A protein has these predicted regions:
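C-terminal structural segments of small proteins and small subunits
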Residues: 69-100
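Solvent-exposed alpha-helical segments within well-ordered globular domains of core cellular machineries
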Residues: 7, 23, 27-30, 49-53, ...
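Short, ordered loop/turn segments at secondary-structure junctions
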Residues: 23, 42-43, 67-70, 88
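Mid-chain, well-packed structural core segment of small domains
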Residues: 52-80
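N-terminal positively charged helical leader segments and presequences
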Residues: 30-53, 59-61
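Structural motif
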Residues: 16-17, 35-36, 61-63, 80-83
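Absolute protein N-terminus
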Residues: 1-2, 100
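N-terminal first-folded block
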Residues: 2-39
Length: 100
């Protein structure tokens, strides 16, 4: 797990730029508000497929990365297999760290 990416995820949450929860994430994606979809690698296959397909359809970058517990801890919430970043700059920064 990339510590810099986790730090930026935490900063994004503190700035109010992370959407979590299945319904809220779906709404953010379909409304065009989402800039990056992060899906935990230990999320269910159904969740991975659902959010991967939805973000692909709306042409929003998505990444299967990290564990549910690590993502949840970074954003200060329990049991969050999906997180949506709604700020382009922070989304780009997180993707940059993940690609290093």
């Amino acid at each position: 797990m990339d510590k810099k990416a986790l730090s930026y995820l935490s900063i994004s949450q503190k700035a109010g730029l992370v959407v979590t929860g299945e319904g809220a994430c779906e709404k953010a994606i379909s409304s065009g508000q989402a800039k990056l979809v992060i899906i935990a690698s230990d999320a269910s296959d159904n969740t991975k497929k659902k959010f991967s397909n939805k973000s692909d359809y709306y042409k929003i970058p998505n990444v299967v990365w990290g564990l549910r517990d690590e993502i949840s801890r970074a954003i200060g919430k329990n049991n969050r297999p999906v997180a949506v970043i709604i700020d382009k700059g922070l989304a780009d920064r997180i993707l940059l760290f993940l690609r290093e």
